[in-house]
Design a protein with these regions (language model features):
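Long, well-ordered mid-to-C-terminal structural blocks that present hydrophobic/aromatic surfaces
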Residues: 219-274
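Short, solvent-exposed loop/turn segments that connect beta-strands within catalytic domains
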Residues: 22-28, 82, 312-314
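Active-site metal-binding motif and surrounding structural segment of the metallo-beta-lactamase
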Residues: 27-28, 40-89, 249-268, 277-284
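C-terminal regulatory/interaction regions
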Residues: 1-6, 12-15, 237, 241-249, ...
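Conserved beta-strand hairpin/beta-sheet module of binuclear metal-dependent hydrolase folds
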Residues: 2-52, 211-237
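Active-site environment of divalent metal-dependent phosphoester hydrolases
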Residues: 13-15, 36-39, 63-69, 96-99, ...
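His/Asp/Glu-enriched short active-site or ligand-binding loop at hydrolase and phosphoryl-transfer sites
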Residues: 284-289, 321
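Flexible, acidic/histidine-containing loops and adjacent segments that form or flank the divalent-metal
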Residues: 2-3, 78-227, 315-361
């Protein structure tokens, strides 16, 4: 049996993944997001993806800059190819937003991408789906079993209905959360058990950033030798609701090899009750520490993973980072204190202790 492999790319404060799947005699490549920068030194996404002659599925989980820029660049580079190298694209983009080509605005990039994808699709070169939500039919995919678990139909409909209005209001939202750095600093001195018991803020669909993340595509992929819960920047309540509806519970947990932690380890994109119905010891966190108003991961997120009620503390938790921990901590401060060692965890980056189904560049 061939070994499927999840490749975890350094993507600054964003996400970029390549999954090479095998299922029996079939194999295929899935690309998930593309990071925030077109500089190949800072974001190796373009160079790595160009090594793949044929991509079976490309997923842009949502249209924030830190997920879309590399994918947008790849599509622009190949849009005029006689044979477009991607079979399918899943992009829940706001294509109805009539805005000119611009720079450094996620919505403008998504609209420009939508125009391009429409032309490629109309020419019969690829299959573009712009309405991917929980329960989306993936039965014709032969190289892996893929189950889309978020967003819900209701959330995605709200996204399309409200997008233009919220985009217009985006400039009125605070550009900087001045309390974030102070909170991060205070959290360093709070024990993880206490942090894990904090109440989470609920997403506000009337805020642009929250709505975009609520519409993020989350899915489970299963192939030979690999299973992963890929959460994009989704919020936990919707993911948990879907899983419980499918019969998962504290007594019948979802078993996966890896969880790609949502939103780079942001504290409000995880919950104890979601973790309680997942059986997994390997957690992937994609971040270099964040940028601007973002400080990732939150120590509170690590606390949830290590201290939620349903955890079997006899099994070590493995955290996989795509940047050395000391680089991340230069921005967010110390994530683990000396007394945290008792919680039984192991830190990994590309230089130490990777399982054979995970690769970190």
């Amino acid at each position: 049996m061939s070994q499927s492999v999840l490749t975890f790319l350094p993507a600054l404060h964003g996400d970029a993944f390549i999954i090479h799947c095998y299922k029996g005699d079939n194999d295929g490549y899935i690309i998930v997001d593309g990071g925030p920068n077109i500089n190949s030194r800072l974001n190796p996404f373009i160079n790595e993806v160009e090594k793949i002659s044929h991509i079976d599925l490309m997923i842009m989980t949502h249209q924030d800059d830190d997920h879309l820029v590399g994918i947008k660049k790849y599509i622009e580079r190949h849009k005029d190819d006689v044979m477009f190298p991607v079979d399918r694209l899943w992009v829940n983009s706001a294509r109805f937003v009539d805005m000119p080509e611009g720079h450094n605005l996620s919505a403008i990039k998504a609209n420009s991408m939508a125009d391009t994808l429409r032309k490629i699709g109309d020419a019969g070169k690829t299959q573009w789906t712009e309405y991917v939500c929980a329960g989306f039919d993936t039965s014709d995919i032969t190289f892996a079993d893929i189950e889309v678990i978020a967003p819900s139909t209701k959330t995605l409909s709200l996204f399309f209905e409200s997008y233009e209005t919220l985009l217009a209001q985006k400039g009125l939202e605070p550009a900087m959360n001045l309390s974030a750095s102070k909170r991060v600093e205070k959290d360093r001195d709070i024990d993880l058990q206490t942090l894990s018991e904090r109440k989470k803020a609920k997403p506000n669909p009337e805020k642009y950033a929250n709505l975009v993340n609520m519409a993020s595509i989350a899915f489970i992929v299963r192939s030979d030798g690999l299973s992963a819960l890929m959460l994009g920047d989704s919020f936990p309540d919707e993911v948990e609701a879907y899983l419980r509806e499918k019969g998962y519970s504290e007594d019948n947990k979802l078993v996966v090899d890896f969880v790609k932690v949502s939103h780079h380890g942001s504290r409000n994109n995880i919950s104890n009750t979601l973790l309680d119905i997942i059986d997994c010891v390997n957690y992937i966190i994609s971040t270099n520490g964040g940028e601007k108003k973002s400080y990732h991961p939150d120590r509170e997120t690590l606390a949830n993973i290590l201290c939620h009620k349903g955890r079997d503390r006899s099994k070590p938790i493995h955290f996989f980072f795509n940047y050395p921990l000391n680089i991340i901590e230069q921005r967010v401060g110390k994530l683990f204190n000396d007394e945290d060692v008792k919680l039984n965890y192991v830190i990994h980056d590309k230089n130490n202790g990777l399982p054979n189904n995970l690769r970190i560049l």
